[in-house]
């Protein structure tokens, strides 16, 4: 049974004021009340929206590795307790503030939020919402923000992949890995080698567009890549694992190759041997998609609108690996943390 979250326990922004026009009943939310402890489902009183804000009836919310980290106090952003995790969602506009011009009540939208979208309602600024084209489902749209926003910037903005180039993608069966494969093969006409930790995950990555797969749990990634492409190497490596997998990816690059670091899912952050960069004129770079929201919003927003456009045109095909109900949010977190997931894991709020 959902618990009632008392006003005394909430940050000031959450406090329920006198009900106004468009304001609705209490809604359910997954709430972190103590770090490193299971989330609880609580009833939250809605607050009035500001003039630039939009209230959204959330249908789907993505679950990301960062959500677990923030609930453990291990993320770079540390919201005060209690808080609701969740940074991406899809849904329908319930109410728009007086100065909102980009969306209206009834519009289907995707959006990003600062860790508060694992709830039946979410309030966010109008500029962090994008309307969903008619032929794109709410579920497919919910897969797009973090995974495809990252993939598009990694493939185009950072690596600048060209048609016919060979791209090595690690953690290839994860949500972002599959998104990178999708964008690189179906939009940029690249040849992708998918690297993952099991034969089943490699098979899925190949079904989603990769030309070949390498199970790096069975031996040297570098040696396996060399067997596929010879001594010339790959043009681009996009790594989300870190540690030895990053180093093998770096050593697999061709002359003037590029490597893009998206994360360290393996838990180890490798040091970059600068002599390898020098000898092959290699470019090593990082990509933290969420940072663009604050540093270069035009680039951030374009990655979202581009993802929606690609989806509308049928160029990309978002993959949902599993869907959990809100009541099973802790099972969903465990599913992601135990590396059981492939593709995007979603919470369904309906």
Swiss-Prot record:
Superkingdom of origin: Eukaryota
Enzyme class name: oxidoreductase
Keyword Magnesium: no
Pfam families: ADH_N, ADH_zinc_N
GO molecular-function term, one example from the UniProt record: oxidoreductase activity
Transmembrane segments: none
EC numbers: 1.-.-.-
Post-translational modification N6-acetyllysine, affected residues: 36, 302, 328
Keyword check for NADP: no
UniProt keyword annotations, A-Z: Acetylation, Oxidoreductase
Modified residues (N6-succinyllysine): 201
InterPro entries associated with the record: ADH-like_C, ADH-like_N, GroES-like_sf, NAD(P)-bd_dom_sf, PKS_ER, Zn-ADH-like_protein
Family: Belongs to the zinc-containing alcohol dehydrogenase family. Quinone oxidoreductase subfamily.
Protein name per its UniProtKB record: Quinone oxidoreductase-like protein 2
């Amino acid at each position: 049974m959902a618990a009632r979250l008392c006003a005394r326990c909430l940050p000031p922004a959450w406090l329920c004021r006198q009900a106004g026009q468009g304001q609705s009943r209490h809604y359910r939310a997954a709430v972190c009340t103590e770090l490193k402890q299971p989330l609880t489902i609580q009833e939250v009183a809605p607050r009035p929206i500001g003039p630039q804000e939009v209230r959204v009836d959330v249908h789907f919310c993505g679950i990301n590795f960062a959500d677990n980290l923030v609930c453990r106090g291990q993320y770079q952003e540390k919201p005060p307790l209690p808080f609701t995790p969740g940074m991406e969602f899809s849904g329908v506009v319930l109410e728009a503030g007086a100065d909102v011009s980009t969306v209206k009540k009834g519009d289907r939208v995707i959006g990003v939020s600062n860790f508060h979208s694992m709830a039946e309602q979410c309030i966010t600024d109008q500029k962090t919402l994008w309307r969903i084209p008619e032929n794109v489902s709410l579920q497919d749209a919910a897969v797009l923000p973090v995974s495809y926003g990252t993939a598009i910037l990694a493939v185009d903005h950072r690596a600048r992949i060209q048609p016919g180039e060979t791209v090595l993608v690690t953690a290839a069966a994860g949500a972002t890995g599959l998104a990178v494969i999708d964008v690189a093969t179906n939009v940029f006409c690249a040849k992708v080698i998918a690297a993952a930790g099991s034969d089943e995950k490699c098979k899925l990555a190949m079904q989603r567009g990769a030309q070949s797969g390498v199970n790096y749990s069975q031996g040297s990634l570098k040696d396996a890549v060399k067997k596929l492409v010879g001594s010339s190497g790959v043009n681009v490596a996009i790594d989300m694992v870190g540690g030895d997998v990053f180093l093998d990816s770096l050593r697999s690059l061709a002359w003037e190759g590029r490597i893009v670091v998206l994360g360290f899912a393996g838990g180890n952050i490798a040091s970059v041997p600068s002599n390898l960069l020098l000898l092959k004129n290699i470019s090593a770079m990082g990509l933290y998609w969420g940072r663009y929201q604050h540093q270069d919003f035009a680039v951030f927003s374009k990655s979202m609108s581009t993802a929606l456009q690609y989806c509308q045109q049928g160029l990309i095909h978002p993959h949902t690996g599993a869907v959990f109900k809100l009541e099973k949010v802790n099972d969903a977190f465990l599913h992601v943390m135990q590396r059981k997931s492939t593709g995007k894991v979603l919470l369904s709020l309906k």
